[in-house]
UniProtKB/Swiss-Prot annotation:
Family to which this protein belongs: Belongs to the binding-protein-dependent transport system permease family. OppBC subfamily.
Annotated organism of origin: Mycoplasma pneumoniae (strain ATCC 29342 / M129 / Subtype 1)
Protein name: Oligopeptide transport system permease protein OppC
Gene3D superfamilies, sorted: MetI-like (1.10.3720.10)
Record-level GO BP terms: peptide transport; protein transport; transmembrane transport
Length: 376
């Protein structure tokens, strides 16, 4: 090019280098992988919605049983007329709500003597104590119920449904979280050890143990182990037996997940560098390998919660756990034999919301972590 040739300045534009938004000029602490995952997760509107639902359920399960003036096991009144009460709100007077009942005449006479009978008591038959009669009552005119405002009414035992619902949710969530935490800790350590010794006898034996446990149906393991480790000769499982059997069933899930992702990352450059520098195997496992699979394990943990609750509830239907205890299983068992609409609706809807919320949030968390999804 001729040194005397001049450039056409109109083809160029002056810029200030200080205002260029170049990443190589930015000074500051780089964002961590955790922060990036959280950003991607909460860009998903559905993830935010279902996460808030999970938080709301947990808060209600903690607060309602503590704040409620009513018990989750004791009836609000010993009067038989307090059973299967309809919901009542502040704008309803004591006589505004009427209930049609079909019971023995003896109970109808109690309603009449209590002053809550609406209309005339039906005529007696030849055997009045054994004959069912239809009549209407205004139950909230009872002295002990005049100041009672149940959001969902009472069940067939006279227990406040709102309190029972959230006490049952709290009990089932507590069992699920304990089982999930213990399963995660034991399964993660087990899977990390197996994955780091791949190709050796230790990995072969440990992998076969996982396969044997997974080969047998989970409910069969629960029945056999529960029958073996029952305490005091009782016919049904208590909470400690339920927790033990569920941990035995579910620990293989995080163990298998950890082993798979350890195998995928065991030959990466930073692991090889750690070995070259003389790092011990236990340090490589717990300092260098496990942090890589933390995100995947978070997905497994969230997914374990509804799975554990589902199995715990199924034990009541199988007759292996008392139906009189507080818990979602016992609550859903009441639904099968009850015509109480409030009890049926609240039980099914709350269980469905919890199950769907945890599964959708687990899927959203998996999408935020999975690099194959991120690159799409």
């Amino acid at each position: 090019m001729d040194k005397h040739q001049k450039f056409d300045q109109s083809l160029f534009q002056r810029v200030d280098i200080n205002v260029l938004k170049r990443s190589d000029q930015l000074i500051g602490k780089p964002t961590t992988n955790f922060v990036e995952i959280m950003k991607r997760l909460f860009q998903n509107k559905w993830a935010i919605l279902f996460f808030l639902l999970i938080v709301l359920i947990i808060l209600l399960a903690i607060i309602v049983p503590l704040a409620s003036p009513y018990s989750a096991v004791t009836p609000v009144s010993n009067n038989a007329l307090a059973q299967n009460l309809p919901p009542r709100y502040l704008w309803n007077g004591a006589g505004d709500i009427q209930v049609e009942k079909i019971t023995a005449r003896s109970i109808a006479e109690v309603a009449q003597s209590s002053g809550v009978l609406v209309g005339k008591l039906p005529e007696a038959s030849s055997n009045p104590l054994a004959t069912n009669v239809k009549y209407n009552i205004a139950p909230y005119q009872l002295a002990e119920l005049k100041n009672y405002y149940p959001l969902l009414g009472t069940n067939g035992l006279g227990v406040d449904i709102w309190t029972l619902l959230w006490a049952s949710m709290a009990k089932s969530l507590w069992i699920a979280i304990v089982v999930a935490l213990v399963s995660m800790v034991f399964g993660t350590i087990y899977g990390a050890i197996a994955g780091s010794f791949v190709g050796r006898a230790a990995d072969n034996i440990m992998s076969r143990i996982i396969e044997i446990i997974d080969l047998v149906p989970s409910i069969l393991w629960i029945i056999v182990l529960g029958a073996t480790f029952r305490f005091g000769g009782v016919k049904q499982f208590d909470d400690s037996v339920v927790i033990f059997t569920l941990i035995f069933v579910f620990w293989t899930w995080p163990a298998a997940t950890t082993r798979i992702y350890i195998l995928k990352n065991k030959d990466t450059e930073y692991i090889q560098a750690a070995r070259t520098l003389g790092a011990k195997q236990i340090r490589i496992i717990f300092v260098h390998m496990l942090p890589v699979v933390t995100g995947r394990l978070a997905v497994v943990f969230v997914s374990l919660i509804p799975a554990v609750i589902g199995y715990e509830a199924s034990l009541v239907f199988l007759g292996l756990k008392p139906a009189t205890e507080v818990g979602l299983g016992a609550l859903l068992n009441q639904v099968t034999s009850s015509g109480n609409i409030a009890l049926i609706t609240s039980s099914i809807v709350s269980f469905a919301i919890l199950t769907v919320s945890t599964r959708v949030f687990a899927n959203a968390l998996n999408d935020a972590i999975d690099p194959r999804v991120i690159r799409r």
